[in-house]
């Protein structure tokens, strides 16, 4: 059995080798193709398209804005996948895309041209389906461009922005994001995990990758118990038994209440947070 991999590219490669022979459970590979090689492959996190769709739904349902702009890295599958799904779901959720701006990994330091177009578009909210390093630069340059009144909304890649070196975290005040876990959540389960993680890792604060992995281990244990796995079973038999057992697992984990479909996808609701006073505060 394999807990992993972390990223989509490696997961697709490993999944091709593991198909039907080694049970594989990725905590955080978000590309759709990460778990499509075999029926023995499962995922804890949301797919890229699901993040885009659910973000559009959340923004629309909570009336956060009607005029929305997007700024994303078009050279990365993660960013592009989320963007495409978000744009596709915008209209049915009452959102008008007034600017859809892109950059690439070769031009991810100066966003002035894109931000000017976004500012001129009259956007009320800027959707940022990027990782936190790029988003930190974007927030700084948006502030410099006089765009503090434009709301900012990200996805799980935004998690970690408060820890970016030399980033003025006050610029993240009011930023909203969908992510499955926050180390500042006040529920007993999350706080116990955070304390144990910090104690074991020299006060390093766990992020959603750590929480997803924690949940994967407990979901795998639940499936192994249900399947009555024994050491003398072959890899193929273990894989088949685990795959069948996973369909009956219901996990109340750090990242939410989860169950799984026959195609290995996780069925759970995302959590929305707003950064307030340097901490994540869960939104309704």
PLM regions: where:
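Segments of small-molecule ligand-sensing domains
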Residues: 199-210, 221-279
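Hydrophobic alpha-helical segments within soluble ligand-binding/sensing domains
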Residues: 44-67, 80-82, 108-112, 135-136, ...
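Beta-alpha junction/loop-to-helix N-cap segments that form part of ligand/metal-binding clefts
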Residues: 1-34, 103-109, 259
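Ligand-binding clamshell of periplasmic/extracellular solute-binding protein-like
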Residues: 3-12, 27-34, 128-136, 154-162, ...
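Sec-exported extracytoplasmic/periplasmic mature domains
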Residues: 15-20, 57-66, 87-95, 116-123, ...
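Extracellular/periplasmic periplasmic-binding protein-like sensory domains
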Residues: 142-214, 274, 280-282
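Extracellular/periplasmic bilobed ligand-binding domains
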Residues: 17-21, 85-178
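An alpha-beta-alpha
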Residues: 41-102, 125
């Amino acid at each position: 059995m394999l807990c992993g991999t972390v990223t989509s590219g490696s997961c697709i490669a490993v999944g091709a080798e593991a198909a039907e022979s080694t049970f594989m459970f990725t905590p955080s590979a978000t590309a759709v193709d990460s778990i499509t090689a075999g029926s023995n492959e499962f995922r804890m996190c949301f797919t890229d398209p699901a993040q885009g769709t659910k973000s559009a739904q959340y923004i629309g349902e909570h009336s956060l804005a009607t005029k929305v702009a997007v700024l994303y890295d078009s050279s990365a599958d993660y960013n592009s996948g989320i963007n495409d799904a978000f744009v596709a779901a915008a209209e049915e959720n009452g959102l008008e895309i007034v600017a859809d701006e892109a950059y690439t990994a070769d031009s991810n330091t100066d966003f002035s041209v894109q931000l000017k177009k976004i500012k001129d578009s009259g956007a009320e909210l800027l959707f940022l389906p990027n990782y936190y390093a790029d988003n930190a630069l974007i927030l700084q340059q948006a502030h410099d461009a006089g765009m503090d009144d434009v709301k900012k909304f990200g996805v799980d890649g935004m998690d970690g922005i408060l820890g970016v070196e030399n980033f003025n975290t006050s610029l993240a005040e009011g930023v909203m994001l969908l992510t499955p876990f926050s180390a500042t959540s006040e529920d007993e389960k999350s706080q116990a995990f955070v304390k144990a993680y910090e104690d074991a890792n020299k006060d390093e604060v766990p992020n959603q990758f750590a929480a997803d992995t924690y949940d994967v281990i407990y979901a795998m244990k639940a499936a192994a118990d249900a399947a009555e796995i024994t050491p003398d079973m072959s890899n193929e038999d273990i894989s088949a038994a685990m795959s069948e057992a996973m369909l009956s697992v219901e996990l109340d984990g750090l990242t939410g209440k989860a169950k799984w479909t026959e195609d290995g996808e996780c069925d759970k609701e995302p959590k929305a947070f707003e950064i307030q006073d340097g901490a994540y505060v869960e939104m309704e």
